[in-house]
Amino acid sequence: VIGTKPDFYKQAPLVVEAKREKLPVFVIDTGQHFDDILGFGIKEFKLEESVGCDLQIRGDLMEKASELILKFGSFGRFCKEEFGSTSKLLPVVHGDTLVAGIAPLAWVFGMGQKVAQNEAGLRSMSPEIMKKLKITQEPTLDLIEKYIQEQFDGKWFIAREEPFPEQIDTWICSAGTQYFFAPTQLNKDNLVKEGYPDEFVHV
């Protein structure tokens, strides 16, 4: 599944490798980045020849979100009617994008199955010292140096809300994911701590 510029670059290798392994693969393009500048990655990686479904999502963030759940869910329903609920179709979404947040939910509603996530387990972290800082506090040289040092020596905590909406998207995506493809061991550790089965999380 591709929708925005980051998707083109992160998902293109999956399409290339699937073809090399002679696995059946096609691209679902949400169409969010469709102009020549933002959409150049589709042409650059020759993804257009693999697009089997173009959802043509447009509008502002709320309009895109609403349209995405309706169209992606409807496509899932169509696939269920055509291929059955035990079909091996497996959408692979990417990272912490809007598509990653909404497509799994829509696919569960439409197809009755979960998805796979590329770049799974992305979680923002902040140093513990952030909790002690006050917005009204005047930044002194000592405070700045302490803040910098704490980033190296201090403990860190998972920040669920920032950046917004990316962190919401990736948390929601995890709940609708069956197979997790994590970029690092830290990302896998995040997912396992959250209760996702170790055997379904691959680094």
Where are these regions (language model features)?
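An aromatic- and histidine-rich active-site surface loop
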Residues: 92-110
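Alpha-helix capping/helix-boundary segments
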Residues: 33, 99, 186-188
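Active-site-proximal region of nucleotide-activated glycan assembly enzymes
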Residues: 112-203
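Helix N-cap/beta->alpha junction signal
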Residues: 4, 97, 184-186
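Hydrophobic/aromatic ligand-binding patch that stacks against planar heteroaromatic rings
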Residues: 17, 103-108, 172-173
